[in-house]
Amino acid sequence: MTQDELKKAVGWAALEYVKPGTIVGVGTGSTAAHFIDALASIKGQIEGAVSSSDASTAKLKSYGIQVFDCNEVDELDIYVDGADEINSQMQMIKGGGAALTREKIIAAIARKFICIADASKQVDVLGKFPLPVEVIPMARSYVARELVKLGGLPEYRQNVLTDNGNVILDVHNLTILDAIALENKINNIAGVVTVGLFANRGADVALIGTADGVKTVELK
């Protein structure tokens, strides 16, 4: 199976977790796009969705799925999204698609976080994939200097603004052994909106696409 076929398999497998009559949290990226395709097949059974990006919102609306503002929703039953990396503790690096802040907000209000990913995203130690940090533009240089102090090599993501109007620093050269501590440390730097470490709020279930089919991993 190609990587895209693996992504499609996990996107459709996530339908099993969608309960009728609920509002579904939907992520961003190529794997989440397959989940939106799948969700469209049962759109008459759900109330609608909350979306983590303008791109996902447009795709949901193109299928006629109602998209709710996050402020209209107290709690979501599930949030389904991909990951750039996921470890055995269900901690993730996310934000390759620059939607990390909205993704983190939706994850916070969801009872269950379903991570959908192909097997290439599974790692023993987080950090090979550059860690995205969303930063208020005027703080870019200061935050970059602080990230260097933490051992990182931050790179300004050129010509990219988040849906919130901020910039992204991608931090290379990290071996993340304590993801919760690093998430807290980076989030405390003035000017950081959020870091793409999902460790304090990791995944509850991971659906991993492999050549042998979709494997389900649950947080122990």
UniProtKB/Swiss-Prot annotation:
GO MF entry, a single one: ribose-5-phosphate isomerase activity
Give me the Gene Ontology terms describing cellular component.
cytosol
Identify the catalytic residues. Answer: E103
Q: Which UniProt keywords apply?
A: Isomerase
> What SUPFAM superfamilies does the record tag this protein with?
D-ribose-5-phosphate isomerase (RpiA), lid domain, NagB/RpiA/CoA transferase-like
- The residues the record assigns to binding substrate are T28, G29, S30, T31, D81, G82, A83, D84, K94, G95, G96, G97, K121
Record text on subunit structure and interactions: Homodimer.
Spell out the protein name for this chain. Ribose-5-phosphate isomerase A
Give the organism, scientific name: Yersinia enterocolitica serotype O:8 / biotype 1B (strain NCTC 13174 / 8081)
Name of encoding gene? rpiA
